[in-house]
Amino acid sequence: MQISFEEEQQVFHLYNDKISYVIQVEKQRYLKHCYYGKRIKRWHSGIKDYYYDRGFCANPIAEDRTFSLDTQLREFPESGQGDFRSPAYELEDRNGDKNARFFYNGYRILSGKIAPDGLPHVYTDADTEAMTLEITLQDKVRNQRILLYYTIYEDAVVTRFAKWINDGTEPIEICRFLSMNMDLPTQEYDVLTLSGAHTEEKNVYRRPLCADSVTIESSRGTVSYTHLRAH
């Protein structure tokens, strides 16, 4: 397993013998999801989105009408910057401002696995069994940071979590904060859920993923026989 960073193309590549996960820093600000799947040797710099002026799409950079966050595959999307899909996080400061201004601000590549404080997580017996990429997003206006953690193992597994740090003096209300987000390229996907009842657990339900919202949850406070985690 290995984590590399290609400076010229601003591309992170997490990989082992089985899988690859590729992230690119776009416009020196935004994290774009490029690839997750079977192991590749290298992310080719020629594999890029075709940018053109799209109607009804907001442009965060006034000088470039071909670039819109609403059409990108995002790693950790925000609200209030022109991406009208579901955000990974939402906030409100004491002035009632809800616009997020977190931009890419560096990275670290670490040996081993970083454990999220107070949350369940997998473990390793030695630091040689995993590598972790830490990416920093910073809001310099409010003096806030979000740390994104990606850990790759010897097996075909990538685990993720996020951490919010308030470096400022003013309180911030966190209205929404997900552990991860994943945007996938347009294809025909199925949603697979496992539902059931007592002594009749894990009935498989499969349906096409359409242009809608699907929520799988349990109000029991734990995974139960009624609804198990989705795939």
Give the residues covered by each predicted segment.
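Conserved small/polar residues in nucleotide/adenosyl-binding loops
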Residues: 226-231
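Acidic, aromatic-enriched beta-alpha/helix-loop junctions
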Residues: 34-60
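Residue-level detector of beta-strand face positions
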Residues: 11-13, 134-136, 163
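Acidic (Asp/Glu-rich), glycine- and aromatic
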Residues: 15, 28-29, 36-39, 52, ...
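Polar, glycine-rich mid-to-C-terminal structural blocks
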Residues: 191-193, 203-221
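Extended, loop-rich substrate-binding clefts of extracytoplasmic carbohydrate-active enzymes
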Residues: 80-157
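Short, Gly/Pro- and small/polar-rich lid/capping loops
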Residues: 1-9
